[in-house]
C-alpha cells in the first residue's frame, strides 16, 4: 500500500496491518494519534528506532507468532540496531501501555509493561516489496 504523504510506512502481514514511523515527531503521531489502545506497539530495546504499530481491529489477546516476529524484525531493521550481527531485543506491548511524560523529547516514551522478543533485523521489503521509504 502507498504511504506517501503520511508519517509512516504500511506493510501487510498475514492479514494484519503494520505501521512503521518515519521519524521522532511522526513516531509520536503514529503512537498517540493514529494507533488505538488495543493495537500492539513494538520498538527495539535500547537504541533509537521507529515506533511500530500492529493494528488489532479484532481485539485479539495475542498476535499470531508469524506476525509478531515479522513486526519485531521490521522494528529492529528501522533502528540503530540494524547493523547488528546477532539477534536484537524488541519490546512489545499494547498501545495503552505506552505513555509520554511531560518534557520527553519527540519519539521518547515510557512503557508501563511489556514483553520482549529476540529477532534478526530484516527489511520490510522481504515481506511484500515495500521500499521502506
Named regions from a protein language model:
Residues 1-133:
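Duplex nucleic acid-engaging cores and interfaces of nucleic-acid transaction enzymes
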Amino acid at each position: 500500500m502507498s504511504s506517501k504523504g503520511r508519517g509512516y510506512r504500511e506493510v501487510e502481514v498475514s492479514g494484519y496491518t503494520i505501521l512503521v514511523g518515519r521519524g521522532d515527531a511522526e513516531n509520536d503521531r503514529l503512537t498517540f494519534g493514529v494507533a488505538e489502545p488495543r493495537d500492539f506497539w513494538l520498538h527495539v530495546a535500547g537504541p533509537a528506532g521507529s515506533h511500530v504499530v500492529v493494528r488489532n481491529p479484532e481485539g485479539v489477546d495475542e498476535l499470531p507468532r508469524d506476525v509478531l516476529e515479522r513486526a519485531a524484525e521490521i522494528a529492529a531493521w528501522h533502528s540503530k540496531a540494524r547493523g547488528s550481527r546477532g539477534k536484537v531485543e524488541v519490546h512489545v506491548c499494547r498501545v495503552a501501555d505506552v505513555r509520554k511524560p511531560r518534557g520527553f523529547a519527540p519519539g521518547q516514551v515510557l512503557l508501563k509493561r511489556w514483553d520482549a522478543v529476540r529477532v534478526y533485523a530484516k527489511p520490510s521489503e522481504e515481506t511484500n516489496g515495500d521500499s521502506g521509504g
